[in-house]
Each structure stands twice: as C-alpha cells, then as structure tokens.
Amino acid sequence: IRCTGSKECYSPCYKATGCPNAKC
C-alpha cells in the first residue's frame, strides 16, 4: 500500500506499513 496524497492520511493506508505520517 502506498500513500500518495493527503486524503490517504485518513484512510487505512495511514496506519499501514510503509505509510509514515511524514507523507501527510
């Protein structure tokens, strides 16, 4: 799973491995 946008911060991706909050 990858976080590519700010809206990902509020999805399961936010807590997924490889999706640090630094991406938000």
Curated annotation (Swiss-Prot):
CC terms in the record's Gene Ontology section: extracellular region
Tissue occurrence: Expressed by the venom gland.
Disulfide bonds: 3-24
Pfam family, one: Toxin_2
Source organism superkingdom: Eukaryota
Subcellular location: Secreted
Keywords: Disulfide bond, Ion channel impairing toxin, Potassium channel impairing toxin, Secreted, Toxin
Record flagged with keyword Phosphoprotein: no
GO molecular function: ion channel inhibitor activity; potassium channel regulator activity; toxin activity
SUPFAM superfamilies to which the protein is assigned, alphabetical: Scorpion toxin-like
Keyword hit for Disulfide bond: yes
UniProt comment concerning the protein's domains: Has the structural arrangement of an alpha-helix connected to antiparallel beta-sheets by disulfide bonds (CS-alpha/beta).
Extra information: This peptide elutes at 21.22 minutes and comes from a fraction that contains 2 components.
UniProt function note: Blocks voltage-gated potassium channels.
Family as reported in the entry's similarity comment: Belongs to the short scorpion toxin superfamily. Potassium channel inhibitor family. Alpha-KTx 06 subfamily.
Protein name: Potassium channel toxin alpha-KTx 6 OcyKTx5
Organism: Opisthacanthus cayaporum (South American scorpion)
Lineage: Eukaryota, Metazoa, Ecdysozoa, Arthropoda, Chelicerata
